[in-house]
UniProtKB/Swiss-Prot annotation:
Coiled-coil features, chain-numbered ranges: none
Family: Belongs to the NAD-dependent glycerol-3-phosphate dehydrogenase family.
Main location per the UniProt record: cytoplasm
Gene Ontology MF terms in the entry: glycerol-3-phosphate dehydrogenase [NAD(P)+] activity; NAD binding
Name by which UniProt lists this protein: Glycerol-3-phosphate dehydrogenase [NAD(P)+]
GO cellular component terms, semicolon-separated: cytosol
Pathway stated in the Swiss-Prot or TrEMBL entry: Membrane lipid metabolism; glycerophospholipid metabolism
Compartments, record wording: Cytoplasm
Active site feature: K185 (proton acceptor)
Length: 320
């Protein structure tokens, strides 16, 4: 099996490094100059410095070079996925598209697999998600992820081909649950970061993580997912990692919000758009999504952290 990776950011590059030791990998970068530099220097100094690309990785900016790949990993931001895939449906027909981004599209409320399936109906679809940082994968540190695919035979094949000595994949057919877990945990991570940034303490973070997990499961069930999927790697596992580490962009964004500091606008923060998409649906369909709604208000500058916590703590008392 040959693998193509669309997106030469930190995560796409890390996957190329991990898989490239045993599998032929073609890594596509949008910028031709960046692709040439990476191909020549064997390093992504802009996005993932300090890690050498294996000999089995070819870097290109020419989409035609991916024609021979059986599997394409889509490592592009969720909010840009639709625009990116437009016009590629014929090129990717018959191939397996594995989305590797985590988010909910603001305009439509759709997840990454839903978007890819709509734009590229002649392809097989899956999602790779779970608790992982690009640096850990590139270093070859033990990492476990969820591979979700509705086709059980294809899921088994992908699991075998993409797993290696340091990257272990667990498969599921619950695509909805897997993509929602990865998206929603980013929202909770912003909330936790804001609490710590505002010096509200570790107890507040623990409460937000626990009630956030319940909120994630509630929303996933509303969308037709199996709630138990949110207790696995793609849900709870990713939640724990993202809410406790400053390597998480969403958590760092929350820290900045809580501390009243500026955050680099060039940094992708998937949880911000996801929070707004979820909050909008919660309003329209009377869903109980208090943390997501508060995060959306924080992101849109309609609420500060102190009032956000007051709003959460003043809700009607209830059974757990």
């Amino acid at each position: 099996m040959s693998v193509g990776i669309l997106g030469a950011g930190a995560f796409g590059t890390a996957l190329a490094i991990s898989l490239g030791h045993t599998t032929p990998v073609t890594l596509w970068a949008r910028d031709a100059k960046q692709a040439q530099v990476m191909q020549n220097t064997r390093e992504n100094t802009a996005r993932l410095p300090g890690f050498a690309l294996p000999a089995g990785v070819k870097v290109t900016s020419n989409l035609a070079d991916l024609q021979g790949c059986d599997v394409l990993l889509l490592a592009v931001p969720a909010q840009k996925l639709r625009q990116f895939l437009r016009g590629l449906d014929q090129m990717v027909a018959g191939k397996t598209l594995v989305t590797c981004c985590k988010g909910i599209e603001l305009e439509t409320g759709m997840g990454p697999v839903d978007i890819a399936r709509e734009i590229c109906p002649q392809s097989e679809h899956a999602i790779l998600t779970g608790p992982s940082f690009a640096n850990d994968i590139a270093k070859g540190l033990p990492t476990a992820l969820t591979l979700a695919c509705a086709n059980p035979d294809r899921a088994r094949q992908l699991q075998q081909e993409l797993s290696n000595g340091t990257l272990r994949l667990y498969r599921t057919s619950d695509v909805i649950g897997a993509q929602l877990g990865g998206a929603l945990k980013n929202v909770i991570a912003i909330a936790c970061g804001a609490a710590i940034g505002a010096q509200l303490g570790e107890s507040a973070r623990a409460a937000l993580m626990t009630r956030g997990n319940a909120e994630m499961q509630r929303y996933a069930q509303h969308k037709g997912a199996d709630a138990s999927t949110l207790s696995g790697l793609s849900g709870f596992g990713d939640l724990v990692l993202t809410c406790t580490s400053e390597l998480s962009r969403n958590y760092r964004f929350g820290l900045a919000l809580g501390a009243g500091k500026a955050f680099d606008p060039a940094t992708t923060v998937e949880g911000a758009a996801t929070a707004c998409a979820v909050a909008q649906e919660a309003r329209e369909k009377a869903l109980d999504m208090p943390i997501s709604s508060v995060v959306a208000a924080l992101v849109e500058n309609r609420l500060d952290v102190e009032n956000a916590m007051t709003k959460l703590l003043s809700r009607s008392l209830k059974e757990e």
